[in-house]
Amino acid sequence: MQQDLNKTIEDFNQLLSKFEAVQQAKNQLEQHVVKYQTTAEGLQVRLIERDDKLAYLQKELDEEQARHNDIAEKITALKERFGIASAQAESLAKQLEHSQANFTRKEQENQELMAKLTTLSQELTELKTTLSEKEKHFAEQQQHIEQSKQQLSTEFQNLANRILDEKSRSFSQSNQTALDSLLKPFREQIEGFQKRVNEIHSESVKGNAGLEAEIKKVLEIGLNMSQQADNLTSALKGEKKTLGNWGEVQLERALQLAGLLEGEHYSAQAHLKDGEGKHNYPDFVLNLPDNKHLIIDSKMSLVAYESAVNAEDDLKRQNKLREHIKAIKNHIDDLSRKDYSNLIGMRSPNFVLMFIAVEPAYIEAMKMDPTLFNYGYEKNVILVSHTTLMPILRTVANLWRIERGNAEAKEISARAGDIYNQICVIAERLGKLGNTLSSASSHYNSTVTALVGQQGLVGKVERFKDLSAKANKTMPNVELLHHAVESERLDVIKADTPEAQPQKDNTAQ
């Protein structure tokens, strides 16, 4: 027993010696760790400097790439604009052909209506003539009937008087019967004649009523056509205020058909001032993205064009069309003098759109004077009709839709950038936490190995349990940790963004 105790003490002393040796090795290891940490800190400083340089070079590369992308986008945009302009030119040419065809068709329909009106007028004249003749014939028949009645009445009276004179003395019942027999044919003839007169009168009244109904229908058609012609004439050659209001209504209807909203995309009769403080009221101010504007005028006079449409011969028509072109040029000169594009608060191109509400008036003017468009263009006034204005208005509506999309895209991009930066910060912090956990796990496994390994302390002190009665506890089972923290995968996120490095520096501070 003493030998065992001595051996145990000897083993314990050896164990203490080993523990001291381990402690000395640990101290040396800690010194090496301090040395390596100092070296690592120097390497970390150099690594930070290298990262800063790489970030600077990456920034320059990104800026150069952005400039290259910007130039490429501008080239692409110019190509797209060229393609759009070509397509618009083709579309405008097709629309012009379609408008000319519509004008020809409308002109043919107008000629057909005029021919129909002429035919109806002739029929009305013929019906009036027929009615007059029938009334004259009826009056003659009435006169003839009255004459016949008077003649028969006179003859009957004469006959009755003569018979009465002859038979007055010997008048008897037989004579009375004979007189009745004699007068009966005359009475029947007079009654039949009166009946026929009444029938003729009834038929004449019915015929007159039907004729009057037909005449009323013809008159109503003529009045309706006359009213429509008066309305068109009033719209074309009415007072300036009426004509201006009509043009504004047509223009505002075109704006609404293009999907534009008043107060948001355009304003009517806006009150503006020029540099001298004079008041100006443009018909319509069209709002464009980037706080820009486009002015449209709609007060074009069409009196001369209305006269040309109603001209009786081609010479008068040509003269009135020349007056129509002169009126257009006068209005162009007036708009050019007003210089709407330089009004205070206006960011408008140096031209004004001059809207001609009647499409045929625009087409006839262009056919009569092909240089008319260039005349307005040189004075910064662009002539447009409903057909040519609608593509412009639809383009403006599309620009507003694109503007809304760009604003939403910018907002989404800003929010996405913030979210991405936050994810990078979280990934960086998770990486640090993972490194700390890996280091703690490594130290834990080393300590467990030293405690429960083949040469660990547990195996060496297990014998103390048998030697001491107080050793009543059971040594718990301590196992190594085998779960590795994959913090390297987070380095991909941190390396992809140049913002991660400044954020990491801020976090470290």
UniProtKB/Swiss-Prot annotation:
- Transmembrane region(s): none
Q: Which UniProt keywords apply?
A: Coiled coil, DNA recombination
| Family matches, as SUPFAM superfamilies | Myosin rod fragments
| Coiled-coil segments on the chain, per record | 1-167
Q: What domain of life is recorded for the organism?
A: Bacteria
| A GO BP annotation | DNA recombination
The answer on whether this UniProt entry bears the keyword Coiled coil reads: yes
Q: What family is it from? A: Belongs to the RmuC family.
Protein role: Involved in DNA recombination.
This protein's name: DNA recombination protein RmuC homolog
**Species whose genome carries this gene:** Pasteurella multocida (strain Pm70)
